[in-house]
Amino acid sequence: RSTESYKNLIVSENNELKVIKPFGPTIARVKMPNELIKNLNDYVDEILSDEDKSKKLDHGSKLAGSVTQEFKLEKEFIDSSGYKSFLSKSVIEWLKISGYGKVDEFKIISSWIVRQFKNEYNPIHWHGGHVSGVGYLKVPDSFGETPQPLTNKSNKNGNLELVYGSRQFLSDSSFSIKPETGYFYFFPHYMMHAVYPFTGTDEERRSISFNALIDEKSFYVYGN
């Protein structure tokens, strides 16, 4: 499946947040406020202009990707920019709509920026913590063409691919997301995912990711 069919997969809606259930676990899709997108991009550009700070915050050695640059966000910025509040409110609403009741705690473990350019990729992997997600701060106007003409398959250049379980009768095992500037996707930490390379442009695909903990009462709802 792909984001083109997400409207058919919505479990419930509340304003801009949509809870999507393409397979076992639910995921959530929410539009970031424009002010937050600007704050995050301004912060990234500020870090990029400071070589010493870029080196200090470098996170590339800790992550799976073959990409140009990955660096951590500073806690002070996470707390003061509205980003932490956005994540907390979105996760709480997602889990409530998904039937998991009230979440009493939300603690960010880490958050980082990924700067990806043509021919770069992120291999299949998963995260730590309890909940994770990715949002898009900049995307190219085009992700390039495929070498062979496509028939009934969509162009997945630059896509985020979520993977869960195995493909069986009446059971899809993957969900492909075409990045759009300003949209954030939330998923459980164990959700395997990969990012495909793109071609045909020198523009940046800039994303932001996080790992967080919620209270154990909510996370271990089915026991430890």
Residue ranges and their predicted role:
Residues 103-105, 200-202:
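A short beta-turn/loop motif at secondary-structure boundaries
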